[in-house]
């Protein structure tokens, strides 16, 4: 396996790759050559692999000599685990050195043969020789050793023994009968509970069977389940009593939580048999007081049933060997030792640290013996830093980092190094003073690669400190998790004998212990020490991993500690991994991840209670399903009770339920599971069940983000220039509400906002320190500590002094100046956001403050308010009268810029006015408006996710004035709130998944606003409003909406409709109500109405109380009441209908009352006017909900009208009415949502006045009234309709919402059908202008237009005619046609065209474009483009025979581009412009910008400026001149002399120096400023780049100029004015793209050919398509086929719209894909060919056939299609036959032509069509149904023709011959005529005509051929021919006459000749 021969379990092999395991010191991976030291055994024992050891066992037990044999690790007499073996070779060949009798664990065995682990007579684990496999065989009954050497009983055993065996004395790994695995005997296997009897044999499961059920008289097979344990096959032979008795005998009398076997049987309850004489784990003598790792024996039982875990042996280790005071692993497991984990040992008897194999005498983890040598993994000069780098003069380290002593036979893993030399590789307890590093995972700390990771020396610790076992040195640290306590203790894994300092950093202070938490002893054991590990926090002993006595993974100290997996730790309830009672371990809920707890709460809200275990959450939709048992029972009950007769005299009870608004029922834990569990372990988040009260400490200076009291503004401007608004103060940081602001000064109680927020998340406010902080803050801010409110949790909320909220009497409070409590919910203060001018109103607003707050005054806050008010009053008013002093608010244009808009008359008309607030949003007014005199502080208010303009409705101007107009609102930071983390959700992907934008859209629809967009990056919500009130996202909008599942949504919709119907009021109650004067209403006490005292009517709810208040009372009560008109809808009281109120009032459930309630829906509309009714004279004053003007409804049915004006007294019910006033008022409020005026029919309402006595109730029992419905002759305009007043509630009624809307849809030929009015149509007819304006076509109904509605059909010319289009494009298309190649594609009739390669197209297009110069802007631009193409790619005389990439070619192209730039930039009047002395410098600069250097020098000479002319003459001369000029400019700059030089002159000097930018005394000078992109590129080419640079160099320099972060050049925008700026990618000029394409061949052709790069008409593709073909000819073919095809199709459509469809086909032939090309050409042909019976081909059709090669059959088929669409079926058949589409032609002929031809007798025409099917070979065969359709017609025509020929023949013989030839054909046709399909009546007529003709032919044949029996022939003809009834009757009569004649002419029967016998 490792390189040697592969003997099978014992054969002697040759040398292996391990090298030195046969007695000689050969080179092996673990020998000297591999690791630098002599060959040694692998695990440090000479008996292990090759050398002669001193008879030492694996764990240090002395072995006696015996016969030589070879085991797995070199033991000759033992098996792999201790049984004696013979001296045969081992399985690995090289392990054959004869050894002594000592086994791997030190016990002496007799000799035997070698098996898998070194013996043959004994099995693999020391048992008797098996008869089967090694795992589970039946052993012979000889007393041989078990798995670990102990003698086995003569019983059978399984492979691992102890997984359910029945023999109590089984020999196995963990549970033999001789001795247990850990030095104690046990009766059963590990994990077994004895013999499985009783109910433990098998797990209980219901028994599934079948049965027969009789249903409806038929037997049906059904599945059954028997819920009884005796029905199971395992228990079918026993009764319940027998099973119970067996369970009792086994000790099972209840739930066996502690007795169930674990994964490996840990925790199984076993019995205690007699202890045998021997029993260590591996064969050593068992001691009565040994534990696994050396702890003191106590009476507590181990989880293995004996004392294996938890008992401390006196002298023996776990494996039966005598303990010695050696180093680690040279002592028993658990024995106390004087050496720490990694300290050096006294001798080298341990197999992991002995001299042989890998080093002389070292322990496993680095103890060193006396000598020193290079370690196995620690030799010098290794390549990797962490694997043994050179240690210099220091000692070399081991595998785990320990420095070895002078040992020649060093262990491979450094086992045996001195513990004081270095820290180990994993930090196992080395001191912190070692200088030697290295080893497998760590090298020298100062120089190595992996110094601090594994094994480096550290004064603190290694990264994995607490798994490292530190020495007892006081200052040393190190360990797996960086624990560095200096108190010596046991190791982190406990029990390996070493001391440890606070393992795992999870506890501190518990002395002694182990990983698994056993009680501390002087030397802790692996599973039982005193040190708490992995999470223990207490000092008392708690549970170990397996239920020991100390705190472990999950222990929290004291007596509450649990086992590692949540198991109990009490000795009486000794727990195991899987079997103890859970307390507070790792798996307890308190230590489970929060997300798992949340999911458990959501999925199982009732927990694990057995009462609710079967109660599952189900949706309401499931209740109605047929599979629901409850629904089935309901159906059964319904059907069973349907025909029962009740004997009771009482009417059937009816339960009436009031209809109200349904509450939003939500689970308490909904939304908490949104948190991602995958990152749960890496986030520190609060508990989901803990109340976290976040402090919002704000000083007076800090203020509230929504108020301006905190700090006075510095300036009246909205935003000072250069100053950045306070982001922290005015914007949100993701938390809602926003975090506390830092105070301006060191005021008492000020805290940092971010710090307080974090503390609120991580600390409990119930902590004493936090409580003390809050109390101190409240004391410092003036709060009364002895207040009764401060004795509860209320004291946890830091509060401001209450005088902060009490305004000064001199300050006028508004919405912007009234401070709000930062600790209140902001939604509760919305009702107080009104502007009040009176002090009384101000007091009423603040009346809800507590008495304590009013008693405590804060002078500091009052002084701050007064100072702010005084400072604001002292500020200089703005000239425009605009008031804006609040911090954070701004305007665009700014207040300073608005001064320039001020007119002489005082107005300030500003376009695009914007008002905003930093961090909250802005409002944009797009139209011009007068902003003079606006007090923006009182008008505009931005809040969190909302905007309020004109909060006071009374001061709001009409729509269109002031700021109450159409505007665009942007609200920033509108993000939803994460319920789990209490933070805003900003992830765009998560916002998309939760459809946040859709929710905002629905809010916009709800508020009658138009949604524009949502930007998730900034949370900006943009929408447009028509007028202003309050807009935003309220608290109710933030709540989760109804489920989006289609089924649930349907149910939710039905519920919403039911609620809406319940909330709608009927007008009947108002029509029956009396009208009471307003004066009497003032005398009515609202409190009396509410209390119902001395009035005789039911008390009202809060709604009616508010309705009866006047304005002042309403706002005074608004602060103390829960009801407010400005509160969210969810805070308002439930609105119920009058019927629901009646239902609430009814006592009992009598059916009579239900009938009364039903009859209330049919109350008479009009009460008799002659019935006087009494009234009390009292009036009810209603609060105005809406300003409704008087409305008039008129129709043809009635002339009556009804006026509703809520400003006047509304109809009210009598006081004695049983309908409550609350319902009436709510009805009046919700009247606008009723469906009184649905559709176009509105019932007439008659205005009546009638009085009702106080004691008289409603007249409920009335007969329904039937009113005829008549169409109205007039239509009420929407502004005058009552529906207009309900526009805010239209969303609740689709009849209103869509009642006045109409969907526009375009029809054929760009026609549009839309509604209009009769008057508008008259105006259109009377219009006499040249072109009809679109506004008149779409004119709405005016306010005075009552004319009926009409429908109008309008046709539009969708594409505006392009003048000169034909003249500009046809020459270029002809050029393209002449230079293209037509290729015939195999398998296709359609050719493919592509341009010819070369530069000819460039030259020809350029020449053609020059002819069109000055024809228009597009033509001029086209000339510029083609000239640029000619300069970059065209053929020039000087470029003939030059290499493309030669320098001369590059310079020539540069000169050509320079020439093109000069011609393009040169203005028409630049050279002829007149200049003066003052302007010549500027003119010179213009000349230089066009590269007119000579003209500029001449101009300088003319003005005696010779020096400047000399400088300009050297432009572009080279680098030396530019350097000199640059130095000169720098000198002028340093001496400040440049301020005396003209700016234009300096710019020219900068051109000479080649510097585009310079800092001077004039400021920053940018030569490219305000220059278009062509000029900037030209300056780069001419002056800034080297004269020898290429076009690419100049282009790159320009790219750097405009693409840099601080760009100083204009980007290459298109030349047309309205260049798009809102595209995702910037749009650049076409010429710039061509330059890029010349410089970079793979530049995107898709971007280059986009029409918007050169024209504002995105549908103009002519130049783009021509460029595509030209570039393809030049070799640029990397454009995608899809883009090419799309561009060709678009350009062809443009040509088609211009009437050039033939050229459109030419364009379509350039499509590469064959199928797309053919389909596009055929479709265009079908749309544009002309159909004429006279003209075969028109000129365009001849062009496409002759010039373009379109097949004629395509043209014919296109004409056939167009003829068919036009109804010209004869032409259609003609063209189909020419196109050889015979099947289609046959169908057309049969459907439309043949019946008419037969009926009308046009046989020749029909024959000319049908004969073409016969003439063409095989055509009739390819036509389906030819035999029963076309063939019948053709045969009938042939027979008719032959009959006519017979009639012209005079020869009798010839006639008879012809008739004989006609007989078969006639007979066959008579048989097939009935098969002719007759889809229409015309076809049936045609069939009858043919049948009649055939009948006549039959008669003629009978006449001509008298020998034929006419009667027989006629009979046959009548049977076969489908004749009409009349004709058949006529023929039958004729046949009967002939038959009678025949009978009469025959002789009598007696005279007939009798037949002879021969004849018979």
UniProtKB/Swiss-Prot annotation:
Regulation: induction: Up-regulated upon Drosophila C virus (DCV) or Sindbis virus (SINV) infection.
Per-repeat ranges for Sequence: 2-3, 9-10, 18-19, 30-31, 35-36, 43-44, 59-60, 73-74, 81-82, 92-93, 105-106, 117-118, 125-126, 135-136, 148-149, 160-161, 163-164, 174-175, 264-265, 266-267, 282-283, 293-294, 304-305, 309-310, 319-320, 333-334, 352-353, 358-359, 365-366, 377-378, 384-385, 387-388, 400-401, 413-414, 426-427, 428-429, 441-442, 454-455, 467-468, 493-494, 496-497, 516-517, 527-528, 546-547, 553-554, 565-566
Domain of life according to the entry: Eukaryota
Post-translational events: Isoform A and isoform C are autoproteolytically cleaved to yield Nup98 and Nup96 or Nup98 only, respectively.
Span of domain Peptidase S59: 886-1028
Biased composition (Polar residues): 704-718, 781-794, 806-850
Biased composition, class Basic and acidic residues, residue ranges: 755-768
Disruption outcome: Defective germline population maintenance and differentiation when both Nup98 and Nup96 are disrupted. RNAi-mediated knockdown in the larval salivary glands results in reduced transcription of developmental genes Eip74EF and Eip75B and compromised transcriptional recovery after heat shock. RNAi-mediated knockdown in the larva results in reduced expression of Hox genes such as Ubx and Antp. RNA-mediated knockdown in the adult fly increases viral replication of Sindbis virus (SINV), vesicular stomatitis virus (VSV) and Drosophila C virus (DCV).
Chain intervals for the UniProt region annotation (46 X 2 AA repeats of F-G): 2-566
Record's comment describing the protein's domains: Contains FG repeats. FG repeats are interaction sites for karyopherins (importins, exportins) and form probably an affinity gradient, guiding the transport proteins unidirectionally with their cargo through the NPC. FG repeat regions are highly flexible and lack ordered secondary structure. The overall conservation of FG repeats regarding exact sequence, spacing, and repeat unit length is limited.
This protein's name: Nuclear pore complex protein Nup98-Nup96
Gene designation per UniProt: Nup98-96
